[in-house]
């Protein structure tokens, strides 16, 4: 004997399917949102290079500082699609973000030039400016960036 589906049963089935689809979609979004962006890899490499410079300065290995400085000044950039997402999020602060990057570039370039001359004091001064530029950018953007692209932690 067959029973015709009543409206309530149909509604329950439709609602269950809709909730399952929505939950699956949200799960996929949260995984995508926590997937590391290319910028994270760039920042990790910059961190390693800055640590290597610190070690080289402590040993007065100016040739190594001269080798590392351009890697910091002309660091890799994320792919264009990621840059567009970041710039869209930055909005009117995009100029400030670019200025921070420009300051890092200029200070790291000066550090490399000083290292080539063997001018330890100038290397340390330029390294300090490089580090201060990194810190200014991180203090201005890191927390809100992480919240925007990785969720609150």
Where do the PLM segments sit?
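Intrinsically disordered, low-complexity basic tails and flexible linkers associated
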Residues: 24-27
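Sequence context surrounding c-type heme c attachment/ligation sites in exported
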Residues: 29-153
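Bacterial N-terminal signal peptides that target proteins for export
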Residues: 2-14
